[in-house]
Amino acid sequence: MTPKLGQKKRHRITVVCTNCKKRKSKCDRTKPCGTCVRLGDVDSCVYLIDSSGQPESSPSLNDADPLRKQSTPAERISPGFIKKRRSSQTRQDEDHWQRVRELESQSSLYYLPIHEETPFFIDLIPNGFYLETKRSADNLFGLFSDRAIENRDPYLQAMVTFRSIAIKKMMDKLGSNGNNVKNGSLPKSFEALSTFDADDERHISDDVVDKGNNCRMHQTIHKSLFNKFAQYRENNAKKFSSETILAKDYLPPLKILESEVLALFEEKIYNMIPIFDMKILRHEITIFYQNIVEKGNPISIKHYDHMVFCIILLIIKICRLSVQFSKLTPYIYPVLQEIDTSKFLALVKHYLFETKVLRKCNLLQLQCLILLRFLHWCAPEDGDGPETQYCQILMGTIISSCKEMGINWYCFSHPEKYSFKINRHTRPSYDIMKPSDYISVFRKIWSYVLFWDRKMCFISGEECQIGKTLQCHFKEEADTPTWYIRMLTLDNLMKKINDTLNDDPGKVDLNLLHRLINDLKRNFHILKSLSKNEKETMRHFDFEMEWIIDLFSLSLLHGEMIFYEYDCNITKFYKSFQDLWDMVIHISEKCYNYFFNSDALEVDSLTKFYTNRIVEIVANKVLVIVPAFILRGDRFKTIQYADKKKMIEFLYGVSSVYFNEFGFEYYRCFRKMFTAKIAYKILNRSCEKDAWRIILNFLLNELKLEDNGDSYIDYNDMRLKDICPIILEFQETVQKYDGYRPDILSIWNNEFYPIGKYNDDMTGFKFQMRIKEMQEFLDMEKYSDRFNIFSSFYDHASSQLAKHTEVDTNISITNEQVAETPQKELLQQPLAPALPVNDLIVSEFDVIEDIFDPVDFVSFF
């Protein structure tokens, strides 16, 4: 502090409110804050002596925050902006800090002043929002979904467009021979996989029998997976008649249900979905068995027997998933594993929509909807969609039902003001469920629904549906009976992050977002460290929360890098490029440890059916983002061809882990394997066949064919210029050159996408590959002694179909280098010859062949 400032400002002794951080003079400490009165926090309004002393001389947050991993605020501010300090805290900035009252006396960090930063805005939708319409659904994809990431990134957008066109060309080629295969139990998106599968099987002859136990195993596994996933969909689509449904045909005896199913549910699973009073639930189940199962009475919809039936079915199915994915010995819970749950989901859907679910709701019905939402998240079937894009409608129904029933913030802020009238035919009845029980269950349900609403914002970037938040402080740990209630203290921060992200995605304050994320990390870390009870049973929640925050940071870093690239901010672009790569490596290491060193994570094996989901989403995000680094490799002098090959080997290793660990069980993972293997084949090229150059040539060629009316694209489909407008703009830039033109990459890097003309030497940037941290994926020996679904499904099919495939091409393939499983190759310098403009138009399969084997599109993957 300067002497001048010291003379102007007097430092009176003040006290600080532990709730809202409002400062008052010491003599006013007996009066509660107006903010606390408004929020109903009068009882918890306590003042502590302001320990900040002289605010303007306090150390910065960067010195006090040991968890801060990203760049400092000064590094994140764009050149020309200045960082301001303030002499006093405003309430608006103070609201950015959510503190747990019990923790504040233990940590001096929370009394450090917050430095105000000049906002720095970035555009997370440079190519607009991504909306897809199809026969069955219209979807606006969240900002951090796979589709939105690919739409934002011009390199990924071009690669995905190339991949889809090339696959369609080969499908048309097979279809012209009458080889299209459709499976009525699988969606239309599986037609390509089924067609290639059948085509391969037709061409396998007796002369390969001696070669191939591998061949037979390949066919057996592939067919069994197709059949299994087709059976999933067939079972879920099954129709029932209420008159023919007998509960005893689907439910185990009550004694087994109580001793095996409910015991497991209460001990291991209930804390994941604490929406019941277990005493009341057991009572309702006993009544249901006495009246319906044992006496053989029909299931009454009028008396809501069907809702109790559905709750039992969902609990059994969830418990069975817990045992199935625990990988424990089959002798654990043997009776549970023998229960056939294949029709349970169809039964639940049948009964749910027998009631007026879109008009009114009761407690049992709401609990059933929440269980169904939980099952969609955990189950191997494709309940939420491959990118969680189908979860919002069910979640919106749950949230609307909560509000209709009075399950909202009032059950925390004004529980004493609820006035109940419980009618005699209510279920559960008044004899078993009193008003105080309703308040307790309402609190559990609201905290659970609220967290899931916030969680989906962090996972996919979609906007929260619950638009209100409150500051929550609890006097005793007894007031937080569930993990979700404990997390209410973080809700204000999570909602602010959502608002900062979604209020205007084209103008997101990056500085504010970084500050809020760091605050969230810090507060969550302290909450986790102070958990006294149920520490063993809560680790999977803490595990998931940490991964959710990492996933959000990863997606945000990618959006940040794309913005700097468009903005030609070379210094920031290089730094964000390195930060994003480091984050990818860090998350990949976590995935590896989850699969191969899970004991160190201290996550209960019976909860893995739940934690698998967030790991699957995060690992998939790595597979989406890594190709963006490989395609950009030529922009950096410090990234040599050997480095790109290491990246490709890394992609292969992560893909092998992801698909071998999840592809056999999870429908959504299996269906991604086709495009993932094609993407890998696109990128795994020899040095003189740069993938990005070939993609650009292919798409420019396709545009020309489209203009001439010779395109393979059906006239009912969108044009390439509409699907990938950046290529149309690039074509206009290329056409400015007459006669001979420079290398197409030079035009892209220097003229069209000018950040490429800057040299690494200007900033002293040197890319760090982190080979040591990547090593586990580079030496992928985990699957060397067993079937590797990612490599075997493709390579074998390619060798079998080579002699049966005719490729319409004028280019000799004698010297074509085939991309196989990653291996060391001689390093060569990329070739960049000048090309005549009239050579841009080539035979329709020439460019495909230049990047693929002749059989790449008639293989499985």
UniProtKB/Swiss-Prot annotation:
Keywords per UniProt: Cytoplasm, DNA-binding, Metal-binding, Mitochondrion, Nucleus, Repressor, Transcription, Transcription regulation, Zinc
PROSITE patterns from the UniProt entry: ZN2_CY6_FUNGAL_1, ZN2_CY6_FUNGAL_2
Annotation: DNA-binding region: 19-47
GO biological-process terms attached to the record: positive regulation of transcription by RNA polymerase II
Highest taxon of the lineage: Eukaryota
Function noted in UniProt: Transcriptional inhibitor with a significantly increased number of target genes in response to oleate.
UniProt-recorded name of the protein: Oleate activated transcription factor 3
Gene giving rise to this polypeptide: OAF3
